[in-house]
Amino acid sequence: MTDVPVSRIRNFSIIAHIDHGKSTLADRLLQDTGTVQQRQMKEQFLDNMDLERERGITIKLQAARMNYTAKDGEKYVLNLIDTPGHVDFSYEVSRSLAACEGALLVVDSSQGVEAQTLANVYLALDNNLEIIPILNKIDLPGSEPERVANEIEEVVGLDCSNIIKASAKAGIGIDEILESIVHLVPPPQDTVDQPLRALIFDSYYDAYRGVIVYFRVMDGQVKKGDRVRLMASGKEYEIDELGILSPNQIPIDSLHAGEVGYFAAAIKTVEDARVGDTITLAEKPAKEPLPGYTEANPMVFCGLFPTDADQYEDLREALEKLKLNDAALSYEPETSTAMGFGFRCGFLGLLHMEIVQERLEREYNLDLITTAPSVVYRVTTVDGEVTEIDNPSLLPPPQKREKIEEPYIQVEMITPETYVGTLMELCQSRRGVFKDMRYFTLSRTAVVYELPLAEVVTDFFDQLKSRSRGYASMEYHLIGYRENPLVKLDILVNGDSVDALAMIVHRDKAYYVGRALTEKLKELIPRHQFKVPIQAAIGSKVIASEHIPALRKDVLAKCYGGDISRKKKLLQKQAKGKKRMKSIGTVDVPQEAFMAVLKLDPQ
């Protein structure tokens, strides 16, 4: 099991869009090489989380080592490094691709090339990987292998003359795939004699052993008991356990250049072993780390509040536990006058946010309210000081700020031609700037727009899917900050500002958003004994307002006929009471009102 010459090692990953059959293909490879016994096999073997199985997406990376005897009689070791296919996790993808020499590009032969596939192929090309194209699901009645092969040639620029036609489900073409990995993917470089450098491509927290780090040895070799240093954090650890993933962990004594494995060294949190960091020996460190390490910064923020104030501690514990496994998640305590105690959390993107929320509710039985997601704004004050703000209620007043800049992203959508018009309309309505349009084949078009991230975080993805009947796919990346005339929109209920409803919007849209929001709140807030004004304001200027009429008790019911002055006296007494009630009464804002912000139609 242990000593394998470097020339017989093949490291590869699988690139595919959601639902194009990546996990099924991985299962089939594990089965055909005898890595996983038939009786232990279950669907999507490498997707460990229930949520991953349910949504059919891969969130955390996995890795597996397979022993394969090729047709030429030689024994090879194949290391499959799984990648998450979703755009929020593109940094993780780039690191796991950096740990490989080749990639299988799996495309559904009934669907064609999708945006995320394309984004990941570009990452693979940046890392100089050998790409092997595979058409999957060719046993389906709707499969069109010729059309899709042409599409791959045109869009990606790969030679598809000897493309592999396969069906992971039916087990067609699996031997061909294994042979092509052996013959086409180059072996790792033989650099066993150099100082140790290894790339971390994933890590997760284990309650008994601390953080388990998955890594690929690039140069040199590492043994159990070695003292290693992580170059980005500068911390040193002693390796207690070293092993290979097959896919279950099998401890061994040493690993050398080209091999993939795991180690445990009593590391406390995942933050200490960041993805992309370089491992080297403490005694003989390498001169410089491997290139490409960056810290994953959260892009989207929202407030999470427990519906029941007693669950605050539970929420904090749950976030702490999730944080152990998710270095990209950030959170800090926050108090809101409307919602009480909670946390302001930062995420990589929308999918990441949804998954964290769903895991909190599902794995920790919490009932949560979320505020509208916001992005990180860059504010320059009059004194020339630049601060980053992720919460609209922290924005300095207009007279103290000089400019607000917001993050912009470049969105690439791949869609059937019929839906191009409606998707362009969607982007225009979100302040998008048209950049480029490319026709791939007769039926597929790529449309490129630059958009403010704030316009995409609420429901852009849902709109994209509903307008294109689910056929369009998108991929985005950050392109920098730009200055825009942005204002803070406050919502006042009965004269008091409700901090959880505050938002930062573009000046041209402020009136429409304010109008829509006040109308929505008028429906949702119950009537009180006194008249309740709802206002949308920018600074001290009210731009839209609605009133909830008072419930009126009939105080004259007991006066039959009788004297007008008697009736006047009762009415004046009622008016006085209402006035007093209005000055000291509080208005309950129901939870649906906070959700209303998320459901506003930005049109």
Curated annotation (Swiss-Prot):
GO terms for biological process: positive regulation of translation; translation. Coiled coil: none annotated. GTP binds at residues 19-24, 136-139. Keywords: Cell inner membrane, Cell membrane, GTP-binding, Hydrolase, Membrane, Nucleotide-binding, Protein biosynthesis. InterPro entries: EF-4, EFG_III/V, EFG_V-like, EFTu-like_2, G_TR_CS, GUFP, LepA_C_sf, LepA_CTD. Signal peptide: none annotated. It is a peripheral membrane protein. Its main location: membrane. Its EC number is 3.6.5.n1. CDD domains: EF4_II, EF4_III, LepA, lepA_C. Required for accurate and efficient protein synthesis under certain stress conditions. May act as a fidelity factor of the translation reaction, by catalyzing a one-codon backward translocation of tRNAs on improperly translocated ribosomes. Back-translocation proceeds from a post-translocation (POST) complex to a pre-translocation (PRE) complex, thus giving elongation factor G a second chance to translocate the tRNAs correctly. Binds to ribosomes in a GTP-dependent manner. Belongs to the TRAFAC class translation factor GTPase superfamily. Classic translation factor GTPase family. LepA subfamily. NCBIfam families: lepA, small_GTP. This is Elongation factor 4.
